[in-house]
Amino acid sequence: MGTINWTKDQQQIIDMRGCNILVSAAAGSGKTAVLVERIFKRITDKRDPVNVDQFVVVTFTKLAAAQMKDRLRERIEQALAEDPSNEHLLRQEGRLSLAHISTVHSFCSEIVKRYFHRIGLDPAFRMGTEAETRL
């Protein structure tokens, strides 16, 4: 992968620490690339590395969530090609399947499934289909 020339705003998002962020921009503006780089920088931070499954990344579409996970996998594999004995990166590659990268609906559904007892829902609840929600 060649060197990317990030804009000032993109670099600020990549480097920001100690807070949650919301990245909102037009289609094709590089949101996915910026978020992948931000996550990669955090999991490879020498002073304070985190595990990839400690992030919550929420997108609007299944395609965007899948692309995010695929690109993050590619970024980790690229780094492993340069340093195949990096145990932390090997663990991150394994943890990627546990990463919380999903759509808004999927994220909310997971929260409800996990905490149904606290909000008084039947544990067998299910999300309505598009047709059902139009009724």
Language-model regions, residue ranges each:
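P-loop NTPase Walker
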Residues: 1-120
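Flexible beta-alpha connector loops of hexameric P-loop NTPases
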Residues: 124-128
